[in-house]
Amino acid sequence: MIKKIFGITALVVFSGFATAQELAVDSVKVEEAAVAAHDDEEGKPLKLHHAEPLYIDLMRDLGARKGEREWNVAMGVTENNGYYELYPLVEYEWAVADRLGLEVEVPFNVYTSAEKLPHKSPGTGVAGIKTSIQYTFLVNKKAYTSMAIGYLNEIELNSFRNYGNGKFFTGNVYNPFFVVAKGWGKTHSISTMVYAGPVFTHHFGSNHVDADWQINSSIHYLIPNSRNFVGLEVNKSITKERFNMVLRPQIRVALNDNTILGLVVGV
């Protein structure tokens, strides 16, 4: 889902074990991968190398292999008229079988100056519990294309200040999605991806359901003989009343065999 965070995001990945910390200014991501993401390893299921966008990431890599896993601890920061909104989160994702990935995420909302909060703003607390599943049903080396389907479910929780004054569970978000990625050119150095699906938000208090479409597209240039890339991610949200779009230029640089740094700017 699209987060309302603008600024620069730094992403660091360590193979073996990693922790990620994402601030609107910088973030760290830690990854433990049991298998490398190359498509030419003998005796292992085919897995193509696609550039995964840095802002809206996947549950697991497309074509994930059993045993891959990753911890993420992140934080987003937004300044709003004299107070700050913090969005820390913790997530764990793993491949329980070849091409099948699961993820559990717990996001938080933290406000630094409660007396300045807008009347309708949520209070500090656990924002919800997200669970998701993703299955890669196509990995075609000849076309250098991978496709996946998945489902994300989020149970929304009441803020700390409203515990005891209302329902503990305030809503539920239903988000089925489809992902397609393709490499272009003789060396597949141009990588494109589309991640799209409807989002239905059920508000338990009013029993009302909001619906919108999220379409996230990206294009990256994979620098030959490296894990580096440069590219652009475009996050779009469409409803009957409005169309929102954020452009996110980004770059990823491998600092060494175990560390990757990614930078994202929201425009």
Residue ranges and their predicted role:
Residues 1-27:
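Bacterial Sec-dependent N-terminal signal peptides
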Residues 22-267:
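Transmembrane beta-barrel domains of Gram-negative outer membranes and organellar outer membranes
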